[in-house]
UniProtKB/Swiss-Prot annotation:
Description of post-translational modifications: N-glycosylated.
Record's keyword terms, sorted: Carbohydrate metabolism, Glycoprotein, Golgi apparatus, Membrane, Signal-anchor, Transferase, Transmembrane, Transmembrane helix
Effect of gene knockout: Mice are viable through adulthood. In their spleen the level of chondroitin 6'-sulfate is almost undetectable. In the spleen of 5-6 week-old mice, the number of CD62L(+)CD44(low) T-lymphocytes corresponding to naive T-lymphocytes is significantly decreased, whereas those in other secondary lymphoid organs are unchanged.
Positions bearing carbohydrate: 63, 74, 96, 250, 413, 457
Reactions catalysed: chondroitin beta-D-glucuronate + n 3'-phosphoadenylyl sulfate = chondroitin 6'-sulfate + n adenosine 3',5'-bisphosphate + n H(+); 3'-phosphoadenylyl sulfate + keratan = adenosine 3',5'-bisphosphate + keratan 6'-sulfate
Entry protein name: Carbohydrate sulfotransferase 3
Topological type in the membrane: Single-pass type II membrane protein
Organ and tissue specificity: Widely expressed. Highly expressed in spleen, lung, eye and stomach. Constitutively expressed at low level during the mid- to late-gestation period. Expressed in the brain in a temporally controlled manner: peaks at 2 weeks after birth in the cerebellum, but at 3 weeks in the cerebrum. Localizes to stromal cells in the bone marrow, and stromal cells in the marginal zone and red pulp of the spleen, but the sense probe did not.
Gene3D superfamilies: P-loop containing nucleotide triphosphate hydrolases
Lumenal topological domain: 39-472
Source organism of this protein record: Mus musculus
Amino acid sequence: MEKGLALPQDFRDLVHSLKIRGRYVLFLAFVVIVFIFIEKENKIISRVSDKLKQIPHFVADANSTDPALLLSENASLLSLSELDSTFSHLRSRLHNLSLQLGVEPAMESQEAGAEKPSQQAGAGTRRHVLLMATTRTGSSFVGEFFNQQGNIFYLFEPLWHIERTVFFQQRGASAAGSALVYRDVLKQLLLCDLYVLEPFISPPPEDHLTQFLFRRGSSRSLCEDPVCTPFVKKVFEKYHCRNRRCGPLNVTLAGEACRRKDHVALKAVRIRQLEFLQPLVEDPRLDLRVIQLVRDPRAVLASRIVAFAGKYENWKKWLSEGQDQLSEDEVQRLRGNCESIRLSAELGLRQPAWLRGRYMLVRYEDVARRPLQKAREMYSFAGIPLTPQVEDWIQKNTQATRDSSDVYSTQKNSSEQFEKWRFSMPFKLAQVVQAACGPTMHLFGYKLARDAASLTNRSISLLEERGTFWVT
């Protein structure tokens, strides 16, 4: 009697074994199963999410970057690029094998038609803009440059829901997996598939209606007709529209509004590495332009300590009690943040073929000093005409007589605001940032303060002039 076959050790052994014994039916079934998990974009997100929810409960710091993604420990952890490469390699092998066997991957034809509704806005002219930033860099303010334009569908931080619903470990493959989930959700949103958010909204929408979309009121497109449905008594939205009362958000109507607009723009502070956006840049259904917004890391930290006081208790304690040393974990986290930003910017400024003409680096300080000029540059880069409506908003909201006390306000006396941190930051705090983020500050043209006097001396500039160097 013939011995039972041992289970093959890798995919190649399986293919070889199946070919030898002619068991094509079993192989095709395997291919179909794998395609369901890898190729089907909408389903993979929910499946990955469910899997990751089983990881021990950990709320990720929105401002932290896992150093393991930059330098893996003992080469035992997968970096994002390695994990992404593994997925792409398996996808390619399955595609080639299925063609050899005469099987056409069904998902390709389905995805090819996914963006057809957007062609109503004008074939070949639709732009997709991603404002890539970190918290407290002025991204809400700069995002308004796109939100105020009537023909742009703008979303404010939709990835917030993913971070609050799916819990990731700080290190290793789980952190890389989070980036893949963010990317897949981001792609579907840029394609106006807003249903992709529903599994991550808590509590879940009913009949595509929700009262809990994060910062709905920060998107004009979600607060205008026909998306703004009649107000329902005793039904109150957590993040309501600012200037009018609307009923719960109808996700179907929101998606339709997105497809009617000429362009799509989205602000995200949870995108860690520029390289992971390559599949989106190369997707033929998207014409993606990435604007990376950066700010002096000293100003960022000063702002975060105020805005996220609970997360920065260790810093506040260190400052108030006069301790000599800050926790090394805190310093490492700060260094990881800066390194992540620097590596993304260096990649963008190198202009690899896939990113050429699709990346722009902008300093918040330049926007604050010359908001209208920088808005024109960003719109020119995106290939979208700037309207008088946006220009008027910029004029009115960058010359406020006094800054709002709201840390999330988008109304600023911007020419004064960008240096305000210098006069409230203790010099020893500036020293920690300068030591941890020196290479990043050098790349972006932020000068080091030599002492407490130079930090608070307004006549001493801590900013190098960089001109059009920032547009690539």
